[in-house]
A protein has these predicted regions:
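N-terminal "first-domain core" detector
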Residues: 7-16
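Surface-exposed, Lys/Arg-rich phosphate-binding patches that contact polyanionic backbones
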Residues: 19-27
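A short, surface-exposed loop/turn module that caps and links secondary-structure elements
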Residues: 38-65
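Negatively charged, low-complexity tracts enriched in Asp/Glu with abundant Ser/Thr
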Residues: 26, 30, 34-38
Length: 129
């Protein structure tokens, strides 16, 4: 009965989210990843102060607030799939252009097809090579 390491899982970036992340300064990338401490089994009981939950057609997309950035992700078989890494002003600009109230950001986003188009674009992107 020796030491058992925790089960391995991956944080998977698609082509778009990888490009969004790599466009950031290296120190900021490391800081965001250090803040993004989560295991797939924790997705059912996330702290609502740190995580948002956006539902569409039975699918659940999560939002993590890391400083001035928002990481949109979901549970995947291999671990956690990152769909987008956006500066908060990008989301706010989207909300402003959509004429949505800033309160209840997640519910407002879930109701707007343009937001899902942004996420779907990330989902369809191939993982970087």
């Amino acid at each position: 009965v020796g030491y058992r390491p925790p089960p391995m899982f991956q944080i998977i970036f698609n082509e778009i989210s990888a490009a969004e992340m790599s466009a950031l300064p290296t120190e900021l990338q490391l800081d965001l990843l250090a803040q993004f401490q989560i295991l797939p089994e924790e997705l059912d009981n996330l702290d609502p102060e740190r995580f948002g939950r956006i539902v569409r057609d039975g699918s659940v997309l999560h939002r993590y607030r890391a400083g001035d950035y928002r990481i949109y992700f979901e549970r995947a078989e291999e671990g956690i799939q990152i769909h987008r890494v956006l500066h908060k002003n990008t989301v706010r600009d989207f909300l402003y252009r959509s004429k949505l109230p800033m309160v209840e950001e997640d519910r407002s986003l879930a109701a707007k097809p343009g937001f899902w188009q942004l996420i779907d674009e990330g989902e369809r992107a191939r993982a970087p090579h």
